[in-house]
Amino acid sequence: MLDQDSNARPWLLLAPVLLFLAVLAAAALAVIRMSVGSNGDEWRSVSLSSYADLATPYYMKSLWLTLRLAFQSTVLAVLLAIPVAIAMARAKSKLARRLLLTGVLLPLLVNLLLQSYGWLIILGPGGVLNNSLLALGIVQRPVQWLYRENGVLLGLIQTAFPLAALPMASALKAISGSYEEAAATMGASRWQILRHVLLPLAMPGILSGALLVFAYNASAFAVPLLLGGRRVSMLAVLVRDQITPLLNWPAASATSVVLMLATLAVMALSQKLVHRSQKMLGNTR
């Protein structure tokens, strides 16, 4: 009896997780099924017309815009996260580590809508950013940030920044300081230590953070809707437009499936390229 109880206990602990994954899988299958249905008869009919409609230039432009903004925000978020992650991993003061961690986690703790409204205040014609640029004499008149790609890009970087910084900080913290000391002893500069020692060793964490940021921003909805409006039509916004006024569930589902497949394809390709580059780097050594 004791052996049976001990064998069953891990499954009991996994039951909530398995149930949650089953619900997610069921929801994904429901979306896929509706994507091959007809409007008004989603569950009984079979039609690929919703996918055919996505081949229009309007949807292709939106798909390209979504992937491009997700990629740009990923690159910039990772670059900005490198010094923050190094500071989090190498800070000796416990207070400094806590303050850095709190600052990084803040975007995850504040509601996404509130963050987007905050960006509306910052990026508006009379907002903080424009007033600062005017006061410094950098610009002569307010810059139009809202309802432009640049404004959406800033919002995407800020909201997804923790996803880039946290895995990177964890990977850097696991690297022994003896590597840096050995490189410094051999005359390496700080830039050389960062480029040839820290970044290659932290590449798994960097890649994990980059993939998280890309997947998160490719499916972003609140930020492009509030900061971009109809002028920056990312695919998630088009999904909402198909549902709210039109109730066209097959079209919305097909758009979601295409977005999911495109995101997975880009993530798989990037991971393969990184693994290949790491293998080539290892062979050269």
Task: Outline where the language-model segments fall.
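A short amphipathic helical element positioned immediately N-terminal to and/or at the very start
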Residues: 46-55
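The alpha-helix within a helix-turn-helix
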Residues: 183
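Membrane-water interface segments at the C-terminal ends of transmembrane alpha-helices
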Residues: 8-40, 57-173, 197-221, 228, ...
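Short, Lys/Arg-rich, polar N-terminal cytosolic tail immediately upstream
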Residues: 1-7
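Short glycine/proline-centered loop/turn elements that form peptide/ligand docking sites
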Residues: 175-179, 279
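Glycine-rich helix-loop "coupling/hinge" segments at transmembrane-helix boundaries
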Residues: 40-43, 221-247, 284-285
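Short cytosolic juxtamembrane segments of multi-pass membrane proteins
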Residues: 273-285
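Glycine/proline-centered hinge or cleavage motifs at structural transition points of membrane proteins
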Residues: 186-188, 200
